[in-house]
């Protein structure tokens, strides 16, 4: 996982193969990311939106801030493809910000760009089972996140700190 702020082109067009590259823009981004790839995909990933590139047997892509000088705040996540799909034809999935399911709770907002939380389910069906929750908590708010048997969880505070099962940590604890 790469947690980044970008305000200018950073990476020239580059190849990927055998895994998925997932880009999620946080709502506080000042601009979107212009995405293009060798499949002919050309789209704007808006703040709050997500783009999933399943590279399969190979794809070249580039993502740059749509407005140079304006900052994007994002996660770039590399997700392994199932072995049977690692040499499959590449494809891309996109989810606009307004299509991300949102649950507003007392003291918490949960956005579900991938996977599910409670009764909310992302409309995307990626080739790898992944849940991505963008959670905003008010001070001293609590939220239970059940982790199904056979799954693992990774929590990354991007602003402030959190306490999980009694252990406190913040972004600095991740070496970011």
Model regions and ranges:
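Glycine- and acidic-residue-biased ligand/ion/polar-headgroup-sensing regions
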Residues: 17-40, 46-50, 139-141, 146-171
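Ligand-binding loop in jelly-roll beta-barrel domains
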Residues: 56-85, 168, 176
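A short secondary-structure junction signal
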Residues: 87-93, 114, 121-126, 143-148, ...
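Long amphipathic alpha-helical segments that form oligomerization/scaffold cores
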Residues: 81-109
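Catalytic micro-motifs at enzyme active sites that drive phosphoryl/nucleotidyl and oxygen chemistry
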Residues: 9-12, 38-41, 62-67
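A short glycine-rich, His/Asp/Glu-containing loop-to-beta-strand
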Residues: 1-26, 98-144
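Generic beta-strand structural signal
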Residues: 43, 49, 61, 73-75, ...
